[in-house]
């Protein structure tokens, strides 16, 4: 089993990785938008109707749902993190995009189409990385505001189940107020699944969702996922082998298998890219739906760039 992992890691190094952003070669925002829209149309299939909208009652918008999704991905792909800056640049393409909606409408519809955006992302993942046997799991803190301002934060006031919380980040040795992003990726660096929880939720609780979505595979994590009871439960219920490094003072200590340590760097590299290129730690959202839509848009933009 470990021999197969070593071979996969060797092939992943030999493979030439494409540039994950085209803004250095393609400065035209409309050209990027048109290219991503064409890909979304090919992948969406039965998710939308002929006009590119999710079937629903009421007025049929001229600027389709697929165009909203593609515009969201295009803006994130070129590093435009502000809606104000995005619509300032879109004024140059009024002729190419005659049915362009207003900024307020775009903000509302981006939240509505976030589920469509995630469904398209999942289809791209299945086409790129559908037969993986090894996965990496990790979490990333998403800070909403400073702890001193947490009582004045209006995010999640209407629904406490979606409200942020106070958590501790061991890698940065700090407490923060916000959420925790849990993600599972393959050896090729494609994020298969992710979720947002309160910052106070322990990493090991996300394995309950992993047990439902995955089976007959190996999941590689860090020391935050150490639990003999959880390891046994995953193996007995879904035949998932959870591999985590031992603590230095742990009984029956064993050295970490080098291939597991190298494989775990995949998801750490992804989190670094999401922070630097896609600026995932920035927060302009005023409510939880807006924040969740931003996270989905950034991860979907990363996935479609990998797909290209």
Residue ranges and their predicted role:
Residues 1-308:
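Short alpha-helical elements
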């Amino acid at each position: 089993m470990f021999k197969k992992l070593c071979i996969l890691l060797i092939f992943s190094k030999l493979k030439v990785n494409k540039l994950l952003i085209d803004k250095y070669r393609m400065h035209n925002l409309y050209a990027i938008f048109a290219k991503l829209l064409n890909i979304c149309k090919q992948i969406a299939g039965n998710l939308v109707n002929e006009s590119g909208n999710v079937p629903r009652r009421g007025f049929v918008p001229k600027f389709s749902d697929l165009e909203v999704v593609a515009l969201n991905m295009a803006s994130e792909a070129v590093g435009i993190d502000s809606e104000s800056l995005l619509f300032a640049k879109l004024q140059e393409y009024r002729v190419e995009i005659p049915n362009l909606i207003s900024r307020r409408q775009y903000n509302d519809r981006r939240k509505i189409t976030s589920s469509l955006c995630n469904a398209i992302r999942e289809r791209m993942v299945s086409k790129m990385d559908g037969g993986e046997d090894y996965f990496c799991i990790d979490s990333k803190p998403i800070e909403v505001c400073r702890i001193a301002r947490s009582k004045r934060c209006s995010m999640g006031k209407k629904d406490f189940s979606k409200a942020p919380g106070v958590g501790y980040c061991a890698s940065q040795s700090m407490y923060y107020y916000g959420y925790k992003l849990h993600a599972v990726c393959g050896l090729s660096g494609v994020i298969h699944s992710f979720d947002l929880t309160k910052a106070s939720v322990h990493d090991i609780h996300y394995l309950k969702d992993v047990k439902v979505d995955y089976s007959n595979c190996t999941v590689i994590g860090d020391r935050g996922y150490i639990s003999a009871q959880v390891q046994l439960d995953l193996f007995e219920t879904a035949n998932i082998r959870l591999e985590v490094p031992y603590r230095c003072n742990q009984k029956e200590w064993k050295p970490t298998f080098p291939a597991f340590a190298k494989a775990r760097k995949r998801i750490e590299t992804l989190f670094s890219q999401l922070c630097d290129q896609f600026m995932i730690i920035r927060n302009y959202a005023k409510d939880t739906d807006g924040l969740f839509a931003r996270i989905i848009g950034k991860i979907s933009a990363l996935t479609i760039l990998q797909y290209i």
